[in-house]
Amino acid sequence: GKMTATERGRILMRFGELIVKNAEEVAQIEARDTGKPLSVARADIVAVARYFEYYGGAADKVHGEQIPYMNGYNVNVVRVPHGVTAHIIPWNYPAQMFGRSLAPALAMGNAAVLKPSEDACLSGIRLAELAMEAGLPPGALNVVTGYGHEAGAALTAHTGINFATFTGSPEVGVLVHESTAKNSVPCVLELGGK
Protein backbone atom coordinates (compact mmCIF):
# COMPACT_ATOMS: atom_id res chain seq x y z
CA GLY A 1 0.00 0.00 0.00
CA LYS A 2 0.83 3.67 -0.13
CA MET A 3 2.93 4.97 2.71
CA THR A 4 2.23 8.44 4.08
CA ALA A 5 4.86 11.15 3.96
CA THR A 6 5.02 11.07 7.76
CA GLU A 7 5.73 7.33 7.73
CA ARG A 8 8.42 7.79 5.08
CA GLY A 9 9.99 10.55 7.14
CA ARG A 10 10.10 8.39 10.25
CA ILE A 11 11.78 5.55 8.37
CA LEU A 12 14.40 7.89 6.90
CA MET A 13 15.06 9.40 10.33
CA ARG A 14 15.46 5.88 11.74
CA PHE A 15 17.79 5.12 8.85
CA GLY A 16 19.90 8.16 9.73
CA GLU A 17 20.09 6.92 13.32
CA LEU A 18 21.19 3.46 12.15
CA ILE A 19 23.89 5.02 9.99
CA VAL A 20 25.20 6.88 13.05
CA LYS A 21 25.02 3.70 15.15
CA ASN A 22 26.95 1.75 12.48
CA ALA A 23 29.17 4.64 11.36
CA GLU A 24 32.50 3.03 12.16
CA GLU A 25 31.63 -0.18 10.29
CA VAL A 26 30.40 1.71 7.21
CA ALA A 27 33.40 4.07 7.32
CA GLN A 28 35.76 1.08 7.40
CA ILE A 29 33.98 -0.38 4.35
CA GLU A 30 34.12 2.97 2.54
CA ALA A 31 37.83 3.47 3.28
CA ARG A 32 38.78 -0.03 2.12
CA ASP A 33 36.60 0.13 -0.98
CA THR A 34 37.69 3.58 -2.19
CA GLY A 35 41.22 3.78 -0.81
CA LYS A 36 40.52 7.05 0.99
CA PRO A 37 41.85 7.76 4.49
CA LEU A 38 39.64 6.46 7.29
CA SER A 39 39.30 9.99 8.73
CA VAL A 40 37.77 11.17 5.44
CA ALA A 41 35.49 8.13 5.24
CA ARG A 42 34.26 8.80 8.79
CA ALA A 43 33.35 12.38 7.82
CA ASP A 44 31.56 11.07 4.72
CA ILE A 45 29.40 8.74 6.82
CA VAL A 46 28.40 11.60 9.12
CA ALA A 47 27.28 13.48 5.99
CA VAL A 48 25.25 10.47 4.79
CA ALA A 49 23.41 10.30 8.10
CA ARG A 50 22.65 14.03 7.89
CA TYR A 51 21.14 13.65 4.42
CA PHE A 52 18.67 11.08 5.69
CA GLU A 53 17.93 13.02 8.88
CA TYR A 54 17.32 16.21 6.89
CA TYR A 55 15.14 14.68 4.19
CA GLY A 56 13.38 12.49 6.73
CA GLY A 57 12.35 15.71 8.47
CA ALA A 58 11.34 17.30 5.17
CA ALA A 59 9.25 14.38 3.87
CA ASP A 60 5.94 15.67 5.25
CA LYS A 61 6.72 19.36 4.73
CA VAL A 62 6.48 19.39 0.93
CA HIS A 63 3.00 20.32 -0.20
CA GLY A 64 1.25 21.53 -3.28
CA GLU A 65 0.12 25.10 -3.50
CA GLN A 66 -2.72 27.19 -4.83
CA ILE A 67 -1.78 30.12 -7.04
CA PRO A 68 -4.35 32.87 -7.68
CA TYR A 69 -4.90 33.20 -11.42
CA MET A 70 -7.67 35.61 -12.43
CA ASN A 71 -11.34 36.35 -11.86
CA GLY A 72 -11.74 33.88 -9.02
CA TYR A 73 -9.76 31.09 -10.68
CA ASN A 74 -6.83 29.39 -9.01
CA VAL A 75 -4.13 27.12 -10.30
CA ASN A 76 -3.53 24.08 -8.10
CA VAL A 77 -0.01 22.71 -8.00
CA VAL A 78 0.12 19.09 -6.91
CA ARG A 79 3.46 17.44 -6.19
CA VAL A 80 3.61 13.75 -7.05
CA PRO A 81 6.50 11.27 -7.04
CA HIS A 82 8.22 10.48 -10.33
CA GLY A 83 7.78 6.76 -9.71
CA VAL A 84 10.92 4.70 -10.24
CA THR A 85 14.14 6.68 -10.19
CA ALA A 86 17.59 5.55 -11.34
CA HIS A 87 20.73 6.77 -9.54
CA ILE A 88 24.14 6.11 -11.08
CA ILE A 89 26.91 7.24 -8.76
CA PRO A 90 30.73 7.43 -9.04
CA TRP A 91 33.50 5.62 -7.20
CA ASN A 92 35.08 8.56 -5.38
CA TYR A 93 32.29 9.42 -2.90
CA PRO A 94 29.92 6.45 -3.02
CA ALA A 95 28.51 6.81 0.50
CA GLN A 96 27.97 10.57 0.25
CA MET A 97 26.42 10.21 -3.20
CA PHE A 98 24.17 7.47 -1.84
CA GLY A 99 22.76 9.97 0.64
CA ARG A 100 22.69 13.00 -1.62
CA SER A 101 20.94 11.19 -4.45
CA LEU A 102 18.66 8.74 -2.66
CA ALA A 103 17.47 10.64 0.43
CA PRO A 104 15.36 13.22 -1.44
CA ALA A 105 14.02 10.63 -3.89
CA LEU A 106 12.90 8.28 -1.11
CA ALA A 107 11.54 11.13 1.03
CA MET A 108 9.24 12.18 -1.80
CA GLY A 109 7.85 8.66 -2.25
CA ASN A 110 9.82 7.35 -5.20
CA ALA A 111 11.17 3.85 -5.57
CA ALA A 112 14.90 4.04 -6.27
CA VAL A 113 17.39 1.90 -8.16
CA LEU A 114 21.01 2.59 -7.26
CA LYS A 115 23.80 1.63 -9.65
CA PRO A 116 27.08 2.29 -7.83
CA SER A 117 30.42 2.25 -9.59
CA GLU A 118 31.84 -1.22 -10.14
CA ASP A 119 35.00 0.14 -8.52
CA ALA A 120 33.35 1.01 -5.17
CA CYS A 121 29.96 -0.52 -4.44
CA LEU A 122 30.35 -2.04 -0.96
CA SER A 123 29.24 0.92 1.17
CA GLY A 124 26.10 1.28 -0.96
CA ILE A 125 25.23 -2.36 -0.41
CA ARG A 126 25.74 -2.06 3.36
CA LEU A 127 23.77 1.18 3.55
CA ALA A 128 20.89 -0.45 1.64
CA GLU A 129 20.88 -3.26 4.21
CA LEU A 130 20.62 -0.66 6.98
CA ALA A 131 17.75 1.03 5.10
CA MET A 132 15.84 -2.25 5.13
CA GLU A 133 16.60 -2.64 8.84
CA ALA A 134 15.19 0.87 9.39
CA GLY A 135 11.90 -0.25 7.85
CA LEU A 136 12.15 0.74 4.20
CA PRO A 137 9.75 -1.62 2.43
CA PRO A 138 11.05 -4.22 -0.02
CA GLY A 139 11.37 -2.74 -3.50
CA ALA A 140 11.64 0.86 -2.32
CA LEU A 141 15.43 0.79 -2.64
CA ASN A 142 17.21 -1.55 -5.02
CA VAL A 143 20.95 -1.86 -5.65
CA VAL A 144 22.19 -3.12 -9.01
CA THR A 145 25.92 -3.74 -9.23
CA GLY A 146 27.94 -4.35 -12.35
CA TYR A 147 29.79 -2.61 -15.12
CA GLY A 148 28.42 0.63 -16.48
CA HIS A 149 28.30 -0.57 -20.07
CA GLU A 150 26.14 -3.51 -18.96
CA ALA A 151 24.19 -2.74 -15.78
CA GLY A 152 24.18 1.04 -16.18
CA ALA A 153 23.17 0.86 -19.83
CA ALA A 154 20.36 -1.59 -19.06
CA LEU A 155 19.11 0.62 -16.23
CA THR A 156 18.99 3.85 -18.24
CA ALA A 157 17.34 2.12 -21.20
CA HIS A 158 14.69 0.42 -19.07
CA THR A 159 11.15 1.57 -19.87
CA GLY A 160 10.14 1.30 -16.20
CA ILE A 161 12.41 4.18 -15.17
CA ASN A 162 10.65 7.54 -14.75
CA PHE A 163 13.62 9.74 -13.78
CA ALA A 164 17.40 9.30 -13.84
CA THR A 165 20.40 10.95 -12.28
CA PHE A 166 24.04 10.39 -13.17
CA THR A 167 27.27 11.71 -11.68
CA GLY A 168 30.46 11.03 -13.58
CA SER A 169 32.37 11.81 -16.74
CA PRO A 170 31.00 13.96 -19.57
CA GLU A 171 31.56 11.11 -22.05
CA VAL A 172 29.41 8.66 -20.09
CA GLY A 173 26.92 11.42 -19.29
CA VAL A 174 26.23 11.83 -23.00
CA LEU A 175 25.49 8.09 -23.25
CA VAL A 176 23.16 8.24 -20.23
CA HIS A 177 21.36 11.28 -21.67
CA GLU A 178 20.91 9.64 -25.07
CA SER A 179 19.63 6.43 -23.48
CA THR A 180 17.06 8.11 -21.22
CA ALA A 181 15.96 10.46 -24.01
CA LYS A 182 14.84 7.49 -26.11
CA ASN A 183 12.13 6.87 -23.51
CA SER A 184 11.47 10.59 -22.81
CA VAL A 185 12.80 10.18 -19.28
CA PRO A 186 14.00 13.32 -17.48
CA CYS A 187 17.67 13.09 -16.58
CA VAL A 188 19.89 15.15 -14.29
CA LEU A 189 23.60 15.02 -15.06
CA GLU A 190 26.47 16.14 -12.83
CA LEU A 191 29.50 15.91 -15.08
CA GLY A 192 33.18 16.38 -14.39
CA GLY A 193 32.65 17.71 -10.87
CA LYS A 194 36.38 17.71 -10.09
Segments predicted by a language model, with ranges:
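Residue-level recognition of specific faces of alpha-helices
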Residues: 11, 18, 44, 51, ...
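Conserved NAD(P)+-binding/catalytic subdomain of aldehyde/semialdehyde dehydrogenases
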Residues: 84, 117, 133-194
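Short alpha-helical
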Residues: 21, 25, 36, 47, ...
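Aromatic/hydrophobic pocket-lining residues that form π-stacking "cages" and hydrophobic walls in ligand
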Residues: 26, 52, 101, 127, ...
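Conserved small-residue-rich beta-alpha loop and adjacent elements
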Residues: 65-139, 162, 184
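Residue-level signal for inorganic ion chemistry
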Residues: 8, 30, 52, 109, ...
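Glycine-rich loop-to-alpha-helix module at the N-terminal edge of alpha/beta enzyme cores
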Residues: 1-62
